[in-house]
Amino acid sequence: MRLVFAGTPEFARIALDALLAAGHDVPLVLTQPDRPAGRGLKLTPSPVKQAALAAGIEVAQPRSLRLDGRYPDEAAAARAQLERVAPDVMVVAAYGLILPQWTLDLPRLGCLNIHASLLPRWRGAAPIQRAIEAGDAETGVTIMQMDAGLDTGDMLLERAVPIGAQQTAAQLHDELARVGGQAIVDALAALAQGGLAPRRQPDAGVTYAAKLYKAEAALDCSLPAAVLARRVRAFNPVPGATIRLPGLDDPVKVWRAQALEQAAGGTSGAVLRADAQGIDIATGQGVLRLLELQKAGGKRQPVDVFVRGWQP
């Protein structure tokens, strides 16, 4: 099948690789413009762009696809490229730009999105992190026929994935990326044979996965320890959960923690114990044990190493 691929981060790169491995003709890739990255803030191409160039695929990087927006010339150029390649379908995965109606209408079979949740739960920007934060037992991938709404299109295929008790957002991301890559390959194969029936999303069970903000990273110790432990996992690696510890001017990043079902016995945020087993923090309900930390400007350390250079 002849398709255009639109995506930007590693999640999308894995899907592109799966499509190419399945033998699909991908003459054009859309991805976000190069961004400054690293300590030197060097302009760096997205993972999708790197994969596309390595495969000899033409790449377009418009800042917008809106013909009436801030960059109409770039949008018009992208439209001309899409019309020239005349795709059967556009596959979209974490692209990062809004697709205007002309884009949705241009491919013969429309635009298919790889969404990292079981819709209609967790529509929006951060479905992986919000599923972990909420304590969901499972999530998954939905292949969706895109429409003008926010992840509201008809569902074509779903694949469920259990969420491990200690699984981080980074680990779940990698698993869902793999599942998503196979799911879109399977969906396109079924679509080509007319064996994929769109299903309207149910009205019940709609939730929204709001974008992650850096301000969320600071752990509020008045909350239950179980909630805080989930946030540590959900915000690993970005934005990274942080906590303030006595004797340190800057917040400390928390990479691993666990909730202990025991009475806190102290004011929320107080350090109850600090040794090689963990740093125990009183919370609104239970105790949060910190297991892996990172000082500002330092390296990640297991707690037994961390406590050697710090005492409350």
UniProtKB/Swiss-Prot annotation:
Main enzyme class: transferase
GO MF term (any one): methionyl-tRNA formyltransferase activity
Cellular component, GO annotation: cytosol
Any single Pfam family the record assigns to this protein: Formyl_trans_C
CDD domains linked to this entry: FMT_core_Met-tRNA-FMT_N, Met_tRNA_FMT_C
InterPro entries on file: Fmt, Formyl_trans_C, Formyl_trans_C_sf, Formyl_transf_N, Formyl_transf_N_sf, Formyl_transferase-like_C_sf, GART_AS, Met-tRNA-FMT_C
Keyword GTP-binding applies: no
Binding of (6S)-5,6,7,8-tetrahydrofolate, residues: S117, L118, L119, P120
EC assignment: 2.1.2.9
Highest taxon, organism lineage: Bacteria
Catalytic activity: L-methionyl-tRNA(fMet) + (6R)-10-formyltetrahydrofolate = N-formyl-L-methionyl-tRNA(fMet) + (6S)-5,6,7,8-tetrahydrofolate + H(+)
Keywords assigned by UniProt, alphabetized: Protein biosynthesis, Transferase
Protein purpose: Attaches a formyl group to the free amino group of methionyl-tRNA(fMet). The formyl group appears to play a dual role in the initiator identity of N-formylmethionyl-tRNA by promoting its recognition by IF2 and preventing the misappropriation of this tRNA by the elongation apparatus.
Family affiliation: Belongs to the Fmt family.
Protein name per Swiss-Prot or TrEMBL: Methionyl-tRNA formyltransferase
